[in-house]
Design a protein with these regions (language model features):
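GST-like domain detector, emphasizing the conserved glutathione-binding G-site
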Residues: 1-154
Length: 154
């Protein structure tokens, strides 16, 4: 049976959108909280996420590097109601470990896998700044993302 994926993040997050696109490429079903949760689900998930964060139980597939990781500034995900994870770059590898359809996302050739990871990391760093600059600076007078974020989290 395919895994059930729950994402916790805001619509404005490019990392959130990247994880959703990976799940879509694998034809896996997912839900994005808090937007697609009912009130009880949203509150219970938020409380568990906060508690797990305080207790240091939020994980990163592939391991945690103290001082180098972005935790907790990126979206979170859960597979089949398990522990929370973060890091959109490791999401595809995590899916590949639990779902055969996701294995095609990671090339078997180590050199190609390196190139895929390099491009992913480069766009996470460089591309993110272009997105944020356009969203919050260039389009500030015409872009609704700030208002949408307030409504979504409000």
């Amino acid at each position: 049976m395919p895994p059930t994926i729950t994402f916790w993040g805001v619509l404005a997050s490019p990392f959130q959108l990247k994880m959703q696109a990976i799940a879509d490429a694998c034809r896996l079903e997912w839900r994005r909280f808090p937007a697609q949760a009912n009130l009880a689900e949203a509150w219970m998930t938020l409380l568990r996420l906060r508690l797990d964060g305080q207790l240091g139980r939020i994980r990163r597939f592939g391991g945690f590097t103290p001082g180098l990781d972005e935790y907790p500034a990126v979206p979170y995900y859960r597979i089949d109601g398990g522990p929370f994870y973060y890091d959109s770059s490791d999401f595809a590898a995590h899916l590949a470990s639990v779902e055969p359809r996701a294995a095609a996302l990671i090339p078997d050739d180590p050199a190609m896998a390196f190139v895929v990871r390099l491009v992913d990391e480069a766009f996470d760093e460089w591309g993110l700044y272009m997105v944020h600059h356009n969203r919050w600076v260039t389009s500030a007078r015409t872009n609704r993302m700030a208002a949408d974020l307030v409504v979504e989290m409000g």
